[in-house]
Amino acid sequence: MAAHCNRVPVIDGHTACVSLEFDLPADKKPSLEEIEKIWTSFTALPQKLQLPSAPVQPIIVRHEENRPQPRRDRENDKGMAVTIGRLRSCPVFDIRFVALSHNTKRGAALGGILNAELLKAQGFFDNL
């Protein structure tokens, strides 16, 4: 995997350009369609528990050539969803894509609240 973030003058939102290679034989590597299906159907424990701060859809896939963009996509699902776009085959690795998350919501404030909600739901505070 290779990834890089660029510092750009935006108010909120971190964008990562990711290239990755699967450690699988060529005939076992997922297609772009399979990868997108995995992303769009992904749910985790916060969604299963329907926690208040959890995004309904934690990963949103965009098909436009110029997305994701911080100004347009950072607030997806209250700022808690990760938006992925520009998924394509990579001549060096297997695939590449751009991912965007809201740094002050998903990455800090609401992310911390979601962690606390998850700990409470799992009974972490019951014996304190």
Model-derived segments and their meaning:
Residues 1-94:
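C-terminal substrate-binding/catalytic lobe of Rossmann-fold NAD(P)-dependent oxidoreductases
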Residues 94-128:
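Generic C-terminus detector
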